[in-house]
Design a protein with these regions (language model features):
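Hydrophobic anchor at the beta1->P-loop junction of P-loop NTPases
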Residues: 5
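Small-molecule kinase domains that catalyze NTP-dependent phosphoryl transfer to phosphate-bearing small molecules
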Residues: 129-177, 188
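P-loop (Walker A) phosphate-binding loop of NTP-binding proteins
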Residues: 8
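ATP-dependent small-molecule kinase phosphotransfer cores
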Residues: 31-88, 94
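Conserved phosphate-donor/acceptor-positioning beta-strand/loop module used by diverse small-molecule
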Residues: 89-93, 103-127
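ATP-binding Walker
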Residues: 11
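Walker A/P-loop
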Residues: 14
Protein backbone atom coordinates (compact mmCIF):
# COMPACT_ATOMS: atom_id res chain seq x y z
CA UNK A 1 0.00 0.00 0.00
CA UNK A 2 1.24 3.47 -0.87
CA UNK A 3 -0.31 6.53 0.80
CA UNK A 4 0.38 10.02 -0.56
CA UNK A 5 -0.11 13.13 1.56
CA UNK A 6 -0.55 16.41 -0.31
CA UNK A 7 -1.36 19.93 0.81
CA UNK A 8 0.08 23.40 0.97
CA UNK A 9 3.52 23.99 2.43
CA UNK A 10 3.22 24.29 6.21
CA UNK A 11 0.01 22.25 6.51
CA UNK A 12 1.69 19.42 8.40
CA UNK A 13 2.51 16.79 5.79
CA UNK A 14 5.86 15.95 7.39
CA UNK A 15 4.31 15.87 10.86
CA UNK A 16 1.51 13.56 9.77
CA UNK A 17 3.76 11.25 7.76
CA UNK A 18 5.84 10.83 10.93
CA UNK A 19 2.70 10.20 13.02
CA UNK A 20 1.54 7.59 10.50
CA UNK A 21 4.93 5.88 10.67
CA UNK A 22 4.86 5.96 14.48
CA UNK A 23 1.31 4.60 14.82
CA UNK A 24 1.02 2.05 12.01
CA UNK A 25 3.18 -0.51 10.25
CA UNK A 26 3.82 2.04 7.51
CA UNK A 27 7.27 3.31 6.56
CA UNK A 28 8.10 6.69 5.10
CA UNK A 29 9.43 6.68 1.57
CA UNK A 30 12.72 8.50 1.27
CA UNK A 31 12.39 11.46 -1.06
CA UNK A 32 15.51 12.09 -3.09
CA UNK A 33 16.33 15.80 -3.17
CA UNK A 34 18.97 17.76 -5.03
CA UNK A 35 18.57 20.81 -2.79
CA UNK A 36 20.91 21.58 0.08
CA UNK A 37 20.28 19.71 3.31
CA UNK A 38 18.56 21.86 5.96
CA UNK A 39 19.57 22.09 9.62
CA UNK A 40 18.13 19.08 11.46
CA UNK A 41 17.78 16.95 8.34
CA UNK A 42 19.78 13.73 8.16
CA UNK A 43 20.78 12.11 4.87
CA UNK A 44 19.27 8.62 4.72
CA UNK A 45 16.67 9.38 7.40
CA UNK A 46 14.95 12.61 6.35
CA UNK A 47 15.51 11.59 2.74
CA UNK A 48 18.37 11.17 0.34
CA UNK A 49 20.33 14.23 -0.70
CA UNK A 50 22.10 13.89 -4.04
CA UNK A 51 23.80 16.05 -6.60
CA UNK A 52 22.19 16.47 -10.02
CA UNK A 53 24.78 14.07 -11.46
CA UNK A 54 24.11 11.43 -8.79
CA UNK A 55 20.37 11.59 -9.49
CA UNK A 56 20.98 11.38 -13.24
CA UNK A 57 23.10 8.26 -12.64
CA UNK A 58 20.27 6.65 -10.63
CA UNK A 59 17.87 7.37 -13.50
CA UNK A 60 20.28 5.82 -16.03
CA UNK A 61 20.58 2.73 -13.80
CA UNK A 62 16.77 2.40 -13.86
CA UNK A 63 16.38 2.87 -10.10
CA UNK A 64 13.95 5.81 -10.18
CA UNK A 65 10.15 5.39 -10.32
CA UNK A 66 9.35 9.08 -10.83
CA UNK A 67 11.26 12.35 -10.82
CA UNK A 68 10.30 15.98 -11.26
CA UNK A 69 11.41 19.55 -10.65
CA UNK A 70 9.77 21.71 -8.01
CA UNK A 71 10.79 24.78 -5.98
CA UNK A 72 14.03 25.13 -7.93
CA UNK A 73 15.21 21.60 -7.14
CA UNK A 74 14.75 18.07 -8.37
CA UNK A 75 12.96 15.35 -6.47
CA UNK A 76 12.71 11.62 -7.13
CA UNK A 77 11.60 8.32 -5.61
CA UNK A 78 13.26 4.91 -5.74
CA UNK A 79 11.49 2.03 -7.49
CA UNK A 80 12.59 -0.25 -4.66
CA UNK A 81 10.38 1.71 -2.23
CA UNK A 82 7.49 2.74 -4.52
CA UNK A 83 6.91 -0.84 -5.72
CA UNK A 84 7.78 -2.54 -2.45
CA UNK A 85 5.39 -4.99 -0.78
CA UNK A 86 5.81 -2.93 2.38
CA UNK A 87 3.33 -0.22 3.31
CA UNK A 88 4.66 3.28 2.67
CA UNK A 89 3.61 6.90 3.13
CA UNK A 90 5.11 9.93 1.43
CA UNK A 91 4.52 13.61 0.80
CA UNK A 92 3.82 14.86 -2.70
CA UNK A 93 3.12 18.15 -4.42
CA UNK A 94 -0.50 18.27 -5.51
CA UNK A 95 0.40 19.01 -9.15
CA UNK A 96 1.95 15.55 -9.44
CA UNK A 97 -1.23 13.58 -8.66
CA UNK A 98 -1.74 12.54 -12.30
CA UNK A 99 1.86 11.39 -12.74
CA UNK A 100 1.73 9.40 -9.52
CA UNK A 101 -1.59 7.76 -10.46
CA UNK A 102 0.06 6.60 -13.71
CA UNK A 103 3.07 5.16 -11.84
CA UNK A 104 1.03 3.63 -9.00
CA UNK A 105 -2.69 3.49 -9.93
CA UNK A 106 -3.77 1.96 -6.61
CA UNK A 107 -2.02 4.66 -4.56
CA UNK A 108 -4.20 6.22 -1.85
CA UNK A 109 -4.11 10.01 -1.96
CA UNK A 110 -5.02 12.34 0.90
CA UNK A 111 -5.14 16.11 0.54
CA UNK A 112 -4.67 17.91 3.86
CA UNK A 113 -6.49 21.23 3.82
CA UNK A 114 -5.89 23.92 6.44
CA UNK A 115 -8.97 25.60 7.85
CA UNK A 116 -6.75 28.54 8.79
CA UNK A 117 -4.23 29.31 6.06
CA UNK A 118 -2.40 31.77 8.33
CA UNK A 119 -1.19 28.93 10.57
CA UNK A 120 0.41 27.28 7.53
CA UNK A 121 1.99 30.64 6.63
CA UNK A 122 3.39 30.99 10.17
CA UNK A 123 4.82 27.47 9.91
CA UNK A 124 6.69 28.53 6.77
CA UNK A 125 8.02 31.63 8.52
CA UNK A 126 9.41 29.45 11.32
CA UNK A 127 11.59 27.45 8.88
CA UNK A 128 14.41 30.01 8.72
CA UNK A 129 14.30 30.18 4.92
CA UNK A 130 15.88 33.04 3.03
CA UNK A 131 13.48 35.96 2.58
CA UNK A 132 13.30 35.21 -1.14
CA UNK A 133 12.53 31.50 -0.59
CA UNK A 134 10.02 32.31 2.17
CA UNK A 135 8.17 34.80 -0.05
CA UNK A 136 8.16 32.24 -2.89
CA UNK A 137 6.69 29.54 -0.64
CA UNK A 138 4.05 31.87 0.83
CA UNK A 139 2.97 32.98 -2.65
CA UNK A 140 2.76 29.33 -3.70
CA UNK A 141 0.62 28.51 -0.64
CA UNK A 142 -1.98 31.10 -1.58
CA UNK A 143 -1.93 30.02 -5.25
CA UNK A 144 -2.27 26.33 -4.38
CA UNK A 145 -4.98 26.94 -1.80
CA UNK A 146 -7.06 29.06 -4.18
CA UNK A 147 -6.52 26.63 -7.05
CA UNK A 148 -7.54 23.65 -4.96
CA UNK A 149 -10.58 25.35 -3.42
CA UNK A 150 -11.88 26.52 -6.81
CA UNK A 151 -11.11 23.42 -8.87
CA UNK A 152 -13.63 20.63 -8.26
CA UNK A 153 -11.97 18.40 -10.87
CA UNK A 154 -8.68 18.65 -9.00
CA UNK A 155 -10.41 17.84 -5.71
CA UNK A 156 -11.95 14.71 -7.26
CA UNK A 157 -8.49 13.36 -8.10
CA UNK A 158 -7.79 12.81 -4.40
CA UNK A 159 -9.27 9.84 -2.58
CA UNK A 160 -9.73 11.81 0.65
CA UNK A 161 -9.71 15.44 1.74
CA UNK A 162 -9.13 16.04 5.44
CA UNK A 163 -9.01 19.32 7.34
CA UNK A 164 -6.18 20.26 9.63
CA UNK A 165 -7.06 22.63 12.46
CA UNK A 166 -3.56 22.05 13.88
CA UNK A 167 -4.98 20.41 17.01
CA UNK A 168 -5.51 16.98 18.59
CA UNK A 169 -8.94 16.55 16.97
CA UNK A 170 -7.40 16.91 13.50
CA UNK A 171 -4.67 14.44 14.41
CA UNK A 172 -7.23 11.95 15.71
CA UNK A 173 -9.36 12.35 12.58
CA UNK A 174 -6.46 11.74 10.19
CA UNK A 175 -5.06 8.80 12.15
CA UNK A 176 -8.56 7.27 12.36
CA UNK A 177 -8.82 7.57 8.58
CA UNK A 178 -5.46 5.84 8.18
CA UNK A 179 -6.64 3.09 10.54
CA UNK A 180 -9.74 2.51 8.38
CA UNK A 181 -7.63 2.49 5.21
CA UNK A 182 -5.19 -0.04 6.70
CA UNK A 183 -8.03 -2.28 7.87
CA UNK A 184 -9.72 -2.11 4.45
CA UNK A 185 -6.40 -2.74 2.66
CA UNK A 186 -5.71 -5.86 4.73
CA UNK A 187 -8.98 -7.42 3.57
CA UNK A 188 -8.51 -6.68 -0.14
Amino acid sequence: MLIALAGVTGVGKSYYSQEIENNFNIKKIHTIRTRAIRPGEIDGITGYFMTEDELDNEIVRGNIAIDFSEFGGRYAYLKSEVFSNDNHVFEMHYTHIDGWKKVKPNMISIYILPRNIEIAINNIKSRNLSKEKEDERIKEVYEQYNNFMNNKELQKKFDYIVYNDFNDDSKTELLSLIGRIVKKWIFL
